[in-house]
Design a protein with these regions (language model features):
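A broadly conserved detector of short glycine/acidic/proline-rich loop/turn motifs that flank catalytic sites
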Residues: 8-10, 24, 83
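Short loop-to-beta-strand transition segments
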Residues: 34-58
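Alpha-helix initiation/capping motif
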Residues: 7, 36, 62-64
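Generic detection of short hydrophobic beta-strand segments and adjacent strand-loop junctions
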Residues: 18-20
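Short amphipathic, charge-patterned alpha-helical segments
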Residues: 23-39
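Eukaryote-biased recognition of intrinsically disordered, low-complexity regulatory segments
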Residues: 1-16
Length: 99
């Protein structure tokens, strides 16, 4: 099981802790959206409003999409508000184009 912690506005609106049976971190958003309808839509809205989120897996900030492919069965995933201009990729860039 993977512990998923939301932070910031998402935590206030959807709760801060989820325990999910996921093996691939790329399934995180869809798993939360199945339990909390509108979650992905809200994440997209926040991203468009200039409030992107960063992805931290097992205490490591993900800065490139290829890093996710090597992280199977994560123990903990945190979705945290990104600091604007903080790097080359944000959660939206990683996940929002995955179908």
């Amino acid at each position: 099981m993977t512990l998923v912690r939301l932070h910031g506005i998402l935590a206030q609106e959807y709760g801060d802790t989820f325990t999910l049976a996921i093996t691939n971190p790329k399934n995180t958003l869809h798993a939360i959206d199945c339990n909390k309808k509108g979650f992905i839509r809200r994440l997209i809205e926040l991203h468009k409003e200039g409030l992107p989120y960063d992805l931290i897996i097992n205490k490591t900030r993900i800065t490139h999409e290829y890093q996710i492919d090597s992280l199977k069965n994560p123990e903990r995933i945190d979705l945290v508000p990104a600091i604007t201009g903080n790097g080359p990729i944000s959660l939206g860039a990683i996940f929002l184009n995955i179908g």
